[in-house]
Amino acid sequence: MELSTVLLLLGLCSAGLVLGSEHETRLVAKLFEDYSSVVRPVEDHREIVQVTVGLQLIQLINVDEVNQIVTTNVRLKQQWVDYNLKWNPDDYGGVKKIHIPSEKIWRPDVVLYNNADGDFAIVKFTKVLLDYTGHITWTPPAIFKSYCEIIVTHFPFDEQNCSMKLGTWTYDGSVVAINPESDQPDLSNFMESGEWVIKEARGWKHWVFYSCCPTTPYLDITYHFVMQRLPLYFIVNVIIPCLLFSFLTSLVFYLPTDSGEKMTLSISVLLSLTVFLLVIVELIPSTSSAVPLIGKYMLFTMVFVIASIIITVIVINTHHRSPSTHIMPEWVRKVFIDTIPNIMFFSTMKRPSRDKQEKRIFTEDIDISDISGKPGPPPMGFHSPLIKHPEVKSAIEGVKYIAETMKSDQESNNAAEEWKYVAMVMDHILLGVFMLVCLIGTLAVFAGRLIELHQQG
């Protein structure tokens, strides 16, 4: 009993499908009996075919800043009425809608005007949905590669305003009129990009009159997309490493000059920065229309490192100066030894000694005590015989020479210590200056644009 019921139901379903297929086959054969796909679907040639166009954005595939091409995945919805494709559902078993190949019917030749690469027209001919009133809905998928003027001035904190201009290629506004389905594209199925976010999307209809035919309008629908770049990738991989290189450059001035590693560290930082820039150069748009923010910051970092090397050479040269080659100007002594240490509170820095030996150690006339060892002033006109003794006089001259040499060496050492002290003061000043320049330079490059984006919300 149950088996027979199942077989009966299957038979009824099969019969329904066969009848439905027969009705649809008969309907399609009747509709296309005398149909021409090259003739506009109007009863009077003076009538205008009204085509409704809607754009559904599915995915933002790629933004090529160099070639200024935006690749998108879209669905282009087109609707119109073909009076040749109407029928009475009662005559065909209640069939109200059918799907037919789009190649078999007349279609508006809607193309992407600002196409940059590939095909201008839609190449995927999917089936259309046709109802008994002659209303046709065609939603083919397409990959559009549209031209977009990429402005890289604020890269990577940039916004781009790109557009898609759609219109019929051969029909003017007097025979085919295209109308936007909505004043903005459909973003209900949009898949978010990891690099871009769409802030605004609008559509406008334009009437364009060309000089060849000033009375004939040509219609187009232009969709504008305002896209903002997500800068996190560039902040982590470019900006922060450059900032760290700048701080590392500043630490060169904290390294003691006597260690002999100042230039080694400076050159190492420069080489590391050069290799880093060679690696990340492909991430930056290679265009000459403008210098992007990130390019300015990388240039600032490079100049910053090179300037530190040049100044380090000057500091090392100052550190190793001696009185035999350089005499310290009075203004240098006054500024770097007397003034700046007091202003900057260098209390832990030991200043070089400036005591000068002003008294002569020996004079030409030496008072020698009496041979008996009793001190006392010599008589008037008396000269000690020891002074006139050649051996004693030679010994005195030797001692005098040694004393003068020691005095000269001491003064030379004091002068050298003064130059080292000046170099140390320069190091401390430059450490603070370079740290400050690093922060101010970073803020000067990026702060203006970040404030502008914050105000825009």
UniProtKB/Swiss-Prot annotation:
Q: Which GO terms describe its biological process?
A: muscle cell cellular homeostasis; neuromuscular junction development; neuromuscular synaptic transmission; neuron cellular homeostasis; neuronal action potential; regulation of membrane potential; skeletal muscle contraction; skeletal muscle tissue growth
**Any stretches that span the bilayer, and where are they?**
231-255, 263-281, 297-316, 429-447
What's one GO-annotated cellular component? neuromuscular junction
Where does the protein principally reside? Answer: membrane
Q: Which reaction does it catalyse?
A: K(+)(in) = K(+)(out); Na(+)(in) = Na(+)(out)
What PROSITE patterns does the entry give?
NEUROTR_ION_CHANNEL
Q: Which UniProt keywords apply?
A: Cell membrane, Disulfide bond, Glycoprotein, Ion channel, Ion transport, Ligand-gated ion channel, Membrane, Postsynaptic cell membrane, Receptor, Signal, Synapse, Transmembrane, Transmembrane helix, Transport
User: Which InterPro entries does the entry mention?
Assistant: Neur_chan_lig-bd, Neur_chan_lig-bd_sf, Neur_channel, Neuro-gated_channel_TM_sf, Neuro_actylchol_rec, Neurotrans-gated_channel_TM, Neurotransmitter_ion_chnl_CS, Nicotinic_acetylcholine_rcpt
Disulfide cross-links: C148-C162, C212-C213
Q: Which residues lie on this side of the membrane: Cytoplasmic?
A: 317-428
Q: Where in the cell is it found?
A: Postsynaptic cell membrane; Cell membrane
Select a single GO molecular function from the record's annotations and give it.
transmembrane signaling receptor activity
- Keyword Transmembrane helix among record annotations: yes
Protein role: Upon acetylcholine binding, the AChR responds by an extensive change in conformation that affects all subunits and leads to opening of an ion-conducting channel across the plasma membrane.
The record describes its quaternary structure and partners as:
One of the alpha chains that assemble within the acetylcholine receptor, a pentamer of two alpha chains, a beta, a delta, and a gamma (in immature muscle) or epsilon (in mature muscle) chains. The muscle heteropentamer composed of alpha-1, beta-1, delta, epsilon subunits interacts with the alpha-conotoxin ImII.
Entry similarity comment: Belongs to the ligand-gated ion channel (TC 1.A.9) family. Acetylcholine receptor (TC 1.A.9.1) subfamily. Alpha-1/CHRNA1 sub-subfamily.
What is the name attached to this protein's record?
Acetylcholine receptor subunit alpha
Q: List the source organism.
A: Mus musculus (Mouse)
What gene name is given for the protein in this entry? Answer: Chrna1
